[in-house]
C-alpha cells in the first residue's frame, strides 16, 4: 500500500488490468482469492509455488495493453534470477520499463541483484528510490515521444 501511495505521488498511475490478465492470474491464485492490481501474489505462491506464479503473473501483466511499466517487490530468500529471463525478453520486446525493489540480506540478496541487473532490470533496496527512478524513466519516455523537431523559426 505504501508503494501505491508513492507511485501516486510520483504521478505513476496504477493500471486497470484487463480480463485476460485477470484470468491468467486466476489460474495460479487460490480459489478463494480474486486477482487485482496491485497483484498480491503471496497467497498464489503458497497455492501454486513461486516459479509458476512469477512466470505466469509477470507474463500476463507485461502483455496487458493497459500496463506500461512494472514495479516488482521481491523477497530475495525465495527467488532465483532464472525466473526472470522471460520478463527480460518481454521488457525489451514490448519496451516497458521494469524496476525491482529487493528485500533481503546477504548472499541471496547480492546474487539476485546481480542476476536481475545482468538482465537489464534495475534493482533498489529502498522503495522510494525505486519509485522515483521508474517515474523518471516514464517522464523521459513521454517527453521523448512528444518533442517536436526544432526548425529555428518562431511561430
Regions found by a protein language model. Name each.
Residues 1-67, 72-75:
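Short glycine-cluster motifs
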Residues 80:
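A C-terminal functional module that forms or caps the active site or interfaces directly
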Amino acid at each position: 500500500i505504501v508503494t501505491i501511495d508513492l507511485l501516486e505521488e510520483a504521478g505513476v498511475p496504477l493500471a486497470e488490468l484487463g480480463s485476460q490478465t485477470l484470468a491468467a492470474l486466476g489460474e495460479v491464485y487460490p480459489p478463494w482469492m480474486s486477482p487485482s492490481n496491485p497483484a498480491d501474489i503471496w497467497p498464489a505462491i503458497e497455492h501454486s509455488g513461486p516459479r509458476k506464479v512469477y512466470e505466469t503473473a509477470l507474463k500476463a501483466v507485461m502483455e496487458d495493453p493497459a500496463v506500461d511499466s512494472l514495479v516488482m517487490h521481491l523477497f530475495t530468500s525465495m527467488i532465483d534470477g532464472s525466473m526472470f529471463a522471460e520478463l527480460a525478453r518481454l521488457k525489451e520486446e514490448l519496451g516497458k520499463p521494469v524496476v525491482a525493489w529487493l528485500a533481503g540480506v546477504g548472499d541471496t540478496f547480492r546474487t539476485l541483484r546481480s542476476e536481475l541487473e545482468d538482465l537489464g532490470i534495475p534493482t533498489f533496496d529502498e522503495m522510494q528510490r525505486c519509485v522515483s527512478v521508474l517515474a523518471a524513466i516514464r517522464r523521459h519516455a513521454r517527453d521523448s515521444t512528444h518533442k517536436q523537431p526544432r526548425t529555428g523559426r518562431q511561430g
